[in-house]
Amino acid sequence: MGDSAWRAHYNSELRAEEIRAVIAAAELGERPFVIGHSFGGFMTMKVASQYGDTLGGAVIVDSPIRSPEEEARHPLTRPSMGNRRVYETFDAALARFRLMPEQPCDNPFIVEFIGRHSLRRAEDGWVWKFDSEAMGSRRFGEPVREYLQAVGCRAALIFGEKSALVSRETASYMSSLMGPRAPVVEVPEARHHVMLDQPLGFVAALRMLLDSWMRNESAEGSGPLRATRDN
């Protein structure tokens, strides 16, 4: 994240167009699947609500939309990435790398790999690659609930059993917005960063969804599902 050029401003319209540009540049063909995690899931909702007729399906991964009642009881904090910070050495910067929200992970080598590829050399030391303007807290000000309700293609939700952001109550509420034919898949033992701490379970969940969609263009599934974990 951060290897591409930075923009003067960011919004969901721009991000949706850039998702479409990536699909075209990668030559993914007609009706590709779009899969987005966390904030990327919100932008998946946006592109699927605006251009759903061009997609084969959209998979939202642990992107929380809570009911007004749950939000009142447990309001979500929207962290900002903060200002640019310079570290004297690569190792000093890497030691500060954290998942957001913080969580334990049984696969620290994956976290370290991401951290190593999230840094770049600057004139005065080492800095994170991301643009703080792109990652500011105001990016959560989009009407994502409306995007989810307006999704114009097959959609599914994957969430972690132990996620700090998407509870089963949250998943149930999102299911009500998506409709009864949208699969909801819970990955056992996974937290918010599903693909890091339970990568095999996450892949199993994705395969289950995408294989079902590809086998039967009209099959959207129904009801909550639970991914199995290979031993």
Model-derived regions: residue spans:
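Catalytic histidine-centered segment of alpha/beta-hydrolase-like enzymes
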Residues: 187-203
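Conserved catalytic-core motifs of eukaryotic protein kinase domains, centered on the activation segment
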Residues: 2-9, 69-72, 168-169
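Conserved alpha/beta-hydrolase catalytic His-Asp/Glu region
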Residues: 88-142
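Conserved serine/cysteine hydrolase catalytic core
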Residues: 119-177, 183-186
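Gly/Ala-rich beta-loop-alpha elbow adjacent to hydrolase catalytic centers
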Residues: 36, 40, 44
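Flexible "cap/lid" loop of the alpha/beta hydrolase fold
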Residues: 45-49, 54-90
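Active-site loop/oxyanion-hole signature of alpha/beta-hydrolase fold enzymes
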Residues: 1-35, 204
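Core-facing hydrophobic residues within beta-strands of well-ordered domains
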Residues: 29, 54-56, 181-182, 190
